[in-house]
Structure formats: structure tokens, C-alpha cells
Amino acid sequence: MESVPESVPSPNSNTPSIPPPVNSVPPFLSKTYDMVDDPLTNEVVSWSSGNNSFVVWSAPEFSKVLLPKYFKHNNFSSFVRQLNTYGFRKVDPDRWEFANEGFLRGRKQLLKSIVRRKPSHVQQNQQQTQVQSSSVGACVEVGKFGIEEEVERLKRDKNVLMQELVRLRQQQQATENQLQNVGQKVQVMEQRQQQMMSFLAKAVQSPGFLNQLVQQNNNDGNRQIPGSNKKRRLPVDEQENRGDNVANGLNRQIVRYQPSINEAAQNMLRQFLNTSTSPRYESVSNNPDSFLLGDVPSSTSVDNGNPSSRVSGVTLAEFSPNTVQSATNQVPEASLAHHPQAGLVQPNIGQSPAQGAAPADSWSPEFDLVGCETDSGECFDPIMAVLDESEGDAISPEGEGKMNELLEGVPKLPGIQDPFWEQFFSVELPAIADTDDILSGSVENNDLVLEQEPNEWTRNEQQMKYLTEQMGLLSSEAQRK
């Protein structure tokens, strides 16, 4: 609100006239009002929420900036004394808030009602002394009230700091106690370590103690061995079969036994070959006993002129029953790569160490040959050992009887006339080109053959896969029995 003008402008001029000195507002009150009413000074001093008092928010800033600007000094205590002489009182004890009935916001004309306390002219000397004493008392009253509050606040802060100090001292004592406990434990550990070192030194100097300790360790080891080597006892049938197979081998040799194809599987394969009308199998069906493998050089080796450098194919070759070992010696040298036109399944075949074959590390990973572990580092195959012993008697009736006795424990597949095999021989297999044609033919001819007969090859592969799965099921069932 705008203040009421204290002077009335004259009708002859536009400028206001100078107010008369009689009944004028004291300069202190006028300057104080302008200072409080200025919006630029609200951060330091401003009106209160009720607009009936003013608050000094920052006394240091008020003394440093505003007092020199309006009153030519920077003494805040002198300003408080001046307020006291004009009847101002402190409203809030926690802050510098002063009020007067004639000091209101927007009503500057009421400043005329504020009168300074001063003595009369008759008793001027006495009243002056009284005024001085009263003014000093009033100033002390206002200042004393603020200082007491400040002292109380400082006392409260001191109490808080003392409590924090006590808490920190308690934590320090607890930490010192923990450090002492840790130091004691460290000393105990050092003493134990010294005792152990002295004990070990004495033990090393005493040979009887060392002998006793070694003997005790040996006794403890002997006690632990029987318990650690306990195994589950096998059934009677499995023990008899295993005893018969291992008794024919060398003594104190650890072998991994894997049965080869038996007579029933050979007869089944003969019948399978006899049922085929392919010219490829006619030469084999004429001699049912002639079956197995021969080495065929790969196309890469043939092109390079070094047919013995690499073997990647498999062919059918004839051999007599007396040449089992010579046939098996050729197996590790051949890498049985899968040819797209050869739908044969080759069983795993071992090798006898007496034939001087290559070591197991040089064999192709496509073979799952029978491995062995012996004390002397030699390889031993129980099946090949049986064949070695019965090679001289293979033709005589006594040799055949001995072979039958040795193979009694081996599980056998169903017989030739079993109706189970009839489902595999109801469909004739398609003709397959000879090995010579495969080697001499180019890749284009092979692709042409595959394009001409895709359905027959697919049906042939499905039949062979199904036959292989059924043979695996039969072998697993025979082992369970």
C-alpha cells in the first residue's frame, strides 16, 4: 500500500512542498520504515506475517549492509537501543522481531503517534539522568532477553555434544578391549607354534619315534584298503561266464572284453545275401563263408599316384576260416569312411598283439577296437587268444568242439529259421554297382546313379537302419538274460 503523503502540493506548482518541521515524523522512524518496506531487503529484514511487526533475519548482514546505508553506522546494539527509546518491544524470543502499535505496514501516517521518551524542560537535568538510566535499562532488558536465549541454545548444543562424546568414548573402550583380546589370542597362537616347532625338532632327533610313526601310518593304510576296495558281488551266472572267459587268457592281465559276431549273426547275414538278386551279392552267396573287408584306396590317393598313402573305402573280399588273424590285421589299416553307396554296418574287431600290429594310438577314431591294459604294457584280446589257440584245430572236429565249449557263455542271437528275421527278408534289395565301377567312375556318374534311383536307395537305407536297431535290441536283451 502506498503511504499517505505528508505534504499537500501547492496549486501553483507540480512539485510537493517541504513538510513543516512541527509534528513531523522522526528521521529514525522514517528511515526504519523505508528500510523494512523496501522489497529488495526482504532477505535481511522484512515485515512479519501479521504486518504489525518487522523481523531482522540476519543480524550480521543487517549490520554490515543496511545500517551503514541508512544510519551511517554499523552497530546493531545502537539500533536496538534506538528502537527501545521509541517504545518498540521484542515479540519472539527466538528471533529479532520488534513491534510497536504505530509501526504498521501500509500505514506510514501512524508514525507520528510514536513519541520518543524524553524529560520535561523543568526537570531537565534530573530527567536527563533518569532518561539515560531508563533507556539503558530498556536496552538491557531487550538485549538481556536475547542473550539468555542464546545462552540456553548454546547449553543445549553443549549437552548434545557431551552425549556424543560419551558415546564415542564408550566405542573407543570397546574397541580397545577387542584389540586386547585379539592380541592375547595371537600370543597364544605364537606359543602353540613354538611348542609345535620344538616338538618336531625333538621328534626328528628321535629315530624311534619316526619308526613308530611310519609303522602307525602303514597300519592305518592297511585298515583303510579293505574298506575302500569293497565291491558288489556279481550274480552266479555272470561270475561263471567271466571266469570262463578270463581263464583262457594270460594271467594277471586286465582286459576289456567285447564279444564279436557269433554264428547266428553270420548265418543271418548269409541268408540276407542269398535273398538278394543283386549281381554284387551273387559272388558272395556262392561262397557264404567268404565275407569281410579289403582295403580300397581313396579317390584322392588314386589321383596322386600313391594308393597306399590313404585308405578311405571298404570292399567285400573272400577269406577262409583259417585266415581270421590275417583279416583282422588289416582292419586297423583301413579307415572305414562311410560311402554314400555302401549301406553296411561293420562290427568292432580287435587285434592280437602277436601279429605285430600298429599301436592303439595310431588307429582311426572311427574304430571302437578292443583295448587292453596289462602290467607289462602288452595288449591282449581274449577272443583273438581263443582264435590263436584253436587255429590249428579249426578244421578238425576236436577244434570245433573246443570252440563251441569256449563260446557257450556268449549270448546268441535267434536262429536262422526264427520268424523274427522273416520281416527283414520280405523285400529284395536293389542292385549295387561293383567296387571296380565305383573306383573307376567319376563323381558325375555317382550323382547320376543317385538321381536315377533315389527312392530305392532311401528304402535300402531305411531297411538297413531298422535291421541295425533290431540287432542292437536283441544283443541288449541277450545280455540282460
Curated annotation (Swiss-Prot):
Gene3D superfamilies: Winged helix-like DNA-binding domain superfamily/Winged helix DNA-binding domain
PANTHER family recorded: HEAT SHOCK TRANSCRIPTION FACTOR, HEAT STRESS TRANSCRIPTION FACTOR A-1B
Location of the motif Nuclear export signal: 467-474
GO cellular component, one term: nucleus
Residues annotated to bind DNA: 25-119
Alphabetized Pfam families for the sequence: HSF_DNA-bind (PF00447)
Protein purpose: Transcriptional activator that specifically binds DNA sequence 5'-AGAAnnTTCT-3' known as heat shock promoter elements (HSE).
PTM description: Exhibits temperature-dependent phosphorylation.
Predominant place of localization: cytoplasm
Residues spanned by motif AHA: 418-427
Localization per record: Cytoplasm; Nucleus
Name used for this protein in its record: Heat stress transcription factor A-1b
